[in-house]
A protein has these predicted regions:
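C-terminal beta-strand-loop-alpha-helix "lid" module of Rossmann-like NAD(P)-dependent dehydrogenases
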Residues: 1-283
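Single conserved hydrophobic/aromatic residue that forms the stacking wall/gate
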Residues: 281-291
Length: 291
Protein backbone atom coordinates (compact mmCIF):
# COMPACT_ATOMS: atom_id res chain seq x y z
CA UNK A 1 0.00 0.00 0.00
CA UNK A 2 2.82 2.40 0.92
CA UNK A 3 4.58 1.79 -2.42
CA UNK A 4 1.36 2.48 -4.34
CA UNK A 5 0.83 5.68 -2.36
CA UNK A 6 4.40 6.75 -3.15
CA UNK A 7 3.88 6.03 -6.86
CA UNK A 8 0.60 7.95 -6.79
CA UNK A 9 2.32 10.98 -5.28
CA UNK A 10 4.99 10.86 -8.01
CA UNK A 11 2.46 10.61 -10.86
CA UNK A 12 0.40 13.43 -9.34
CA UNK A 13 3.50 15.64 -9.19
CA UNK A 14 4.37 14.76 -12.81
CA UNK A 15 0.82 15.60 -13.85
CA UNK A 16 1.11 19.06 -12.26
CA UNK A 17 4.50 19.68 -13.93
CA UNK A 18 3.13 18.60 -17.32
CA UNK A 19 0.10 20.83 -16.81
CA UNK A 20 2.31 23.89 -16.31
CA UNK A 21 4.46 22.99 -19.32
CA UNK A 22 1.35 22.37 -21.41
CA UNK A 23 -0.05 25.82 -20.72
CA UNK A 24 3.21 27.38 -21.90
CA UNK A 25 3.39 25.13 -24.96
CA UNK A 26 -0.24 25.88 -25.89
CA UNK A 27 0.47 29.60 -25.86
CA UNK A 28 3.46 29.06 -28.15
CA UNK A 29 1.39 26.95 -30.54
CA UNK A 30 -1.49 29.43 -30.63
CA UNK A 31 0.80 32.40 -31.23
CA UNK A 32 2.81 30.65 -33.96
CA UNK A 33 0.01 28.90 -35.86
CA UNK A 34 -1.22 31.97 -37.81
CA UNK A 35 2.30 32.44 -39.23
CA UNK A 36 2.57 28.79 -40.32
CA UNK A 37 -0.87 28.91 -41.90
CA UNK A 38 -0.10 32.17 -43.69
CA UNK A 39 3.20 30.80 -45.03
CA UNK A 40 1.53 27.64 -46.32
CA UNK A 41 -1.32 29.60 -47.89
CA UNK A 42 1.11 32.03 -49.51
CA UNK A 43 3.12 29.25 -51.15
CA UNK A 44 -0.08 27.42 -52.16
CA UNK A 45 -1.53 30.56 -53.73
CA UNK A 46 1.76 31.47 -55.39
CA UNK A 47 2.07 28.10 -57.11
CA UNK A 48 -1.64 28.01 -57.95
CA UNK A 49 -1.51 31.44 -59.60
CA UNK A 50 1.77 30.98 -61.44
CA UNK A 51 0.62 28.78 -64.27
CA UNK A 52 3.02 26.12 -65.53
CA UNK A 53 6.20 26.33 -63.50
CA UNK A 54 9.27 24.11 -63.51
CA UNK A 55 11.52 24.15 -60.48
CA UNK A 56 13.64 21.55 -58.60
CA UNK A 57 11.54 22.04 -55.46
CA UNK A 58 8.46 21.03 -57.45
CA UNK A 59 9.99 17.94 -59.05
CA UNK A 60 11.29 14.66 -57.68
CA UNK A 61 15.06 14.40 -57.89
CA UNK A 62 16.88 11.48 -59.44
CA UNK A 63 17.38 9.83 -56.04
CA UNK A 64 14.96 7.21 -54.69
CA UNK A 65 16.05 7.95 -51.13
CA UNK A 66 13.48 9.34 -48.72
CA UNK A 67 14.28 11.53 -45.73
CA UNK A 68 11.92 11.52 -42.75
CA UNK A 69 12.09 14.15 -40.01
CA UNK A 70 10.67 12.23 -37.04
CA UNK A 71 9.57 14.33 -34.06
CA UNK A 72 9.05 12.49 -30.77
CA UNK A 73 10.13 13.17 -27.17
CA UNK A 74 13.21 12.62 -25.03
CA UNK A 75 11.17 11.16 -22.18
CA UNK A 76 8.59 8.45 -21.82
CA UNK A 77 5.50 8.19 -19.60
CA UNK A 78 3.40 9.89 -22.27
CA UNK A 79 0.99 7.12 -23.18
CA UNK A 80 1.10 6.20 -26.87
CA UNK A 81 2.50 9.57 -27.97
CA UNK A 82 5.91 8.30 -29.12
CA UNK A 83 4.87 4.87 -30.40
CA UNK A 84 2.04 6.30 -32.51
CA UNK A 85 4.42 8.67 -34.31
CA UNK A 86 6.98 5.91 -34.87
CA UNK A 87 4.31 3.60 -36.32
CA UNK A 88 3.56 6.12 -39.07
CA UNK A 89 7.05 5.38 -40.37
CA UNK A 90 7.59 1.71 -39.55
CA UNK A 91 4.14 0.53 -40.67
CA UNK A 92 4.24 2.38 -44.00
CA UNK A 93 5.51 0.06 -46.73
CA UNK A 94 6.86 2.98 -48.75
CA UNK A 95 9.58 3.56 -46.17
CA UNK A 96 12.03 0.68 -45.95
CA UNK A 97 15.32 0.51 -44.09
CA UNK A 98 17.07 0.53 -47.48
CA UNK A 99 15.44 3.59 -49.04
CA UNK A 100 14.85 5.79 -45.97
CA UNK A 101 17.06 7.90 -43.73
CA UNK A 102 15.76 9.48 -40.53
CA UNK A 103 16.47 12.89 -39.05
CA UNK A 104 15.49 12.29 -35.44
CA UNK A 105 14.11 14.93 -33.10
CA UNK A 106 13.63 13.07 -29.82
CA UNK A 107 15.57 10.13 -28.41
CA UNK A 108 12.50 7.90 -28.02
CA UNK A 109 11.75 7.88 -31.71
CA UNK A 110 15.44 7.75 -32.61
CA UNK A 111 16.08 4.66 -30.50
CA UNK A 112 12.92 2.92 -31.74
CA UNK A 113 13.61 3.31 -35.46
CA UNK A 114 17.30 2.54 -34.97
CA UNK A 115 16.32 -0.81 -33.46
CA UNK A 116 14.17 -1.39 -36.55
CA UNK A 117 17.26 -0.92 -38.74
CA UNK A 118 16.72 2.61 -40.10
CA UNK A 119 19.73 4.86 -40.66
CA UNK A 120 19.87 7.95 -38.45
CA UNK A 121 21.21 10.68 -40.74
CA UNK A 122 20.94 13.42 -38.10
CA UNK A 123 20.12 13.68 -34.40
CA UNK A 124 18.48 16.92 -33.24
CA UNK A 125 16.93 15.56 -30.06
CA UNK A 126 17.69 18.65 -27.99
CA UNK A 127 15.45 20.73 -30.26
CA UNK A 128 12.26 19.29 -28.76
CA UNK A 129 13.07 20.39 -25.20
CA UNK A 130 12.29 24.01 -26.08
CA UNK A 131 11.35 24.51 -29.74
CA UNK A 132 13.20 27.36 -31.44
CA UNK A 133 13.01 28.58 -35.03
CA UNK A 134 16.82 28.42 -35.17
CA UNK A 135 16.69 24.66 -34.58
CA UNK A 136 14.06 24.24 -37.28
CA UNK A 137 16.23 26.26 -39.67
CA UNK A 138 19.22 24.04 -38.93
CA UNK A 139 17.23 20.90 -39.70
CA UNK A 140 15.70 22.50 -42.79
CA UNK A 141 19.08 23.63 -44.09
CA UNK A 142 20.47 20.11 -43.77
CA UNK A 143 17.63 18.30 -45.56
CA UNK A 144 17.35 20.98 -48.26
CA UNK A 145 21.06 20.66 -48.93
CA UNK A 146 20.72 16.90 -49.42
CA UNK A 147 17.67 17.42 -51.63
CA UNK A 148 19.26 20.01 -53.91
CA UNK A 149 22.39 17.85 -54.26
CA UNK A 150 20.20 14.95 -55.35
CA UNK A 151 21.13 12.71 -52.42
CA UNK A 152 17.49 12.40 -51.35
CA UNK A 153 14.40 12.55 -53.55
CA UNK A 154 11.62 13.20 -51.04
CA UNK A 155 11.37 14.84 -47.62
CA UNK A 156 8.65 13.98 -45.10
CA UNK A 157 7.78 15.34 -41.67
CA UNK A 158 6.21 13.21 -38.93
CA UNK A 159 4.83 15.15 -35.99
CA UNK A 160 1.79 15.20 -33.69
CA UNK A 161 -1.00 17.75 -34.02
CA UNK A 162 -2.29 19.06 -30.69
CA UNK A 163 -6.08 19.27 -30.48
CA UNK A 164 -6.57 19.16 -26.72
CA UNK A 165 -5.33 17.25 -23.69
CA UNK A 166 -7.42 14.24 -24.73
CA UNK A 167 -6.69 14.26 -28.46
CA UNK A 168 -3.31 14.35 -30.21
CA UNK A 169 -3.11 13.28 -33.85
CA UNK A 170 0.12 11.76 -35.28
CA UNK A 171 0.55 13.12 -38.79
CA UNK A 172 2.84 12.67 -41.79
CA UNK A 173 3.36 15.57 -44.18
CA UNK A 174 5.32 15.65 -47.42
CA UNK A 175 7.57 18.71 -47.50
CA UNK A 176 9.40 18.26 -50.81
CA UNK A 177 8.95 18.03 -53.67
CA UNK A 178 5.84 20.18 -53.46
CA UNK A 179 2.98 18.53 -55.32
CA UNK A 180 1.51 21.36 -57.36
CA UNK A 181 -1.92 19.71 -57.74
CA UNK A 182 -2.25 19.00 -54.01
CA UNK A 183 -1.12 22.41 -52.89
CA UNK A 184 -3.36 24.03 -55.51
CA UNK A 185 -6.33 22.19 -54.00
CA UNK A 186 -5.30 23.57 -50.62
CA UNK A 187 -5.11 27.04 -52.10
CA UNK A 188 -8.74 26.76 -53.23
CA UNK A 189 -9.73 26.23 -49.59
CA UNK A 190 -8.01 29.41 -48.44
CA UNK A 191 -10.43 32.10 -47.29
CA UNK A 192 -11.06 34.97 -49.66
CA UNK A 193 -8.28 37.53 -49.52
CA UNK A 194 -6.63 39.90 -52.00
CA UNK A 195 -4.27 37.24 -53.31
CA UNK A 196 -7.22 35.04 -54.35
CA UNK A 197 -8.38 37.69 -56.80
CA UNK A 198 -5.10 37.52 -58.70
CA UNK A 199 -5.46 35.41 -61.83
CA UNK A 200 -1.75 35.23 -62.63
CA UNK A 201 1.46 36.17 -60.84
CA UNK A 202 4.49 37.59 -62.60
CA UNK A 203 7.90 37.49 -60.94
CA UNK A 204 10.84 39.81 -61.17
CA UNK A 205 13.55 38.90 -61.80
CA UNK A 206 12.38 35.26 -62.18
CA UNK A 207 10.03 32.68 -60.62
CA UNK A 208 12.98 30.39 -59.86
CA UNK A 209 14.65 33.04 -57.73
CA UNK A 210 11.40 33.76 -55.91
CA UNK A 211 10.94 30.09 -55.08
CA UNK A 212 14.60 29.76 -54.09
CA UNK A 213 13.96 32.48 -51.53
CA UNK A 214 10.58 31.43 -50.18
CA UNK A 215 10.68 27.60 -50.21
CA UNK A 216 13.45 27.29 -47.58
CA UNK A 217 11.42 29.58 -45.30
CA UNK A 218 8.34 27.50 -46.09
CA UNK A 219 10.12 24.26 -45.13
CA UNK A 220 11.63 25.79 -41.99
CA UNK A 221 8.22 27.12 -40.95
CA UNK A 222 6.55 23.74 -41.32
CA UNK A 223 9.33 22.05 -39.34
CA UNK A 224 9.05 24.66 -36.60
CA UNK A 225 5.28 24.25 -36.61
CA UNK A 226 5.79 20.50 -36.18
CA UNK A 227 8.14 21.10 -33.24
CA UNK A 228 5.71 23.45 -31.51
CA UNK A 229 2.67 21.21 -32.06
CA UNK A 230 4.57 18.10 -30.95
CA UNK A 231 5.89 19.83 -27.83
CA UNK A 232 2.34 20.72 -26.80
CA UNK A 233 1.10 17.23 -27.72
CA UNK A 234 3.82 15.57 -25.65
CA UNK A 235 2.91 17.50 -22.51
CA UNK A 236 -0.80 16.99 -23.14
CA UNK A 237 -0.30 13.24 -23.56
CA UNK A 238 1.92 13.04 -20.47
CA UNK A 239 -0.54 15.01 -18.36
CA UNK A 240 -3.34 12.68 -19.44
CA UNK A 241 -1.21 9.58 -18.80
CA UNK A 242 -0.21 10.80 -15.35
CA UNK A 243 -3.81 11.70 -14.55
CA UNK A 244 -4.88 8.16 -15.46
CA UNK A 245 -2.00 6.70 -13.46
CA UNK A 246 -2.91 8.82 -10.43
CA UNK A 247 -6.57 7.77 -10.68
CA UNK A 248 -5.53 4.12 -10.96
CA UNK A 249 -3.25 4.49 -7.93
CA UNK A 250 -6.06 6.05 -5.89
CA UNK A 251 -8.43 3.28 -6.95
CA UNK A 252 -5.83 0.65 -6.06
CA UNK A 253 -5.19 2.28 -2.66
CA UNK A 254 -8.93 2.28 -1.97
CA UNK A 255 -9.16 -1.38 -2.96
CA UNK A 256 -6.11 -2.32 -0.88
CA UNK A 257 -7.46 -0.38 2.11
CA UNK A 258 -10.76 -2.24 1.86
CA UNK A 259 -8.99 -5.60 1.65
CA UNK A 260 -6.68 -4.63 4.52
CA UNK A 261 -9.62 -3.61 6.72
CA UNK A 262 -11.48 -6.81 5.90
CA UNK A 263 -8.42 -8.90 6.69
CA UNK A 264 -7.87 -6.98 9.92
CA UNK A 265 -11.53 -7.42 10.87
CA UNK A 266 -11.34 -11.14 10.13
CA UNK A 267 -8.16 -11.41 12.20
CA UNK A 268 -9.76 -9.61 15.16
CA UNK A 269 -12.87 -11.77 14.89
CA UNK A 270 -10.71 -14.89 14.82
CA UNK A 271 -8.78 -13.76 17.88
CA UNK A 272 -12.00 -13.00 19.79
CA UNK A 273 -13.42 -16.38 18.82
CA UNK A 274 -10.29 -18.12 20.07
CA UNK A 275 -10.34 -16.15 23.36
CA UNK A 276 -14.00 -16.97 23.99
CA UNK A 277 -13.44 -20.62 23.16
CA UNK A 278 -10.47 -20.73 25.51
CA UNK A 279 -12.50 -19.14 28.32
CA UNK A 280 -15.34 -21.57 27.80
CA UNK A 281 -12.92 -24.49 27.86
CA UNK A 282 -11.12 -23.42 31.05
CA UNK A 283 -14.13 -22.21 33.07
CA UNK A 284 -15.72 -24.87 35.45
CA UNK A 285 -19.05 -26.36 34.46
CA UNK A 286 -22.17 -25.97 36.74
CA UNK A 287 -21.83 -29.64 37.84
CA UNK A 288 -18.26 -29.03 38.96
CA UNK A 289 -19.42 -26.04 41.01
CA UNK A 290 -22.08 -28.17 42.90
CA UNK A 291 -19.47 -30.75 43.80
Amino acid sequence: KESVQSTGQITKAMKLVSSVKLQKAKVGAEVSKPYFDAMYEAVAAMIAKSGEMSHPFLQKSRSDKKAVILITSNRGLAGGYNSNAVKLLTKDERFTTENTVVYAVGTKGRDSVEREGYTIAGDYSEAINEPLYADASEIGKEVLSKFTMGEIGEIYLIYTIFKNTMVQIPTMMKLLPINASDITADAEDVEENPIDRITLMNYEPAPEEALNAIIPKYVNSLIFGGLVESHASENGARMQAMDSATSNAEEMISDLSLKYNRARQASITQELTEIIACLLYTSPSPRDKRQ
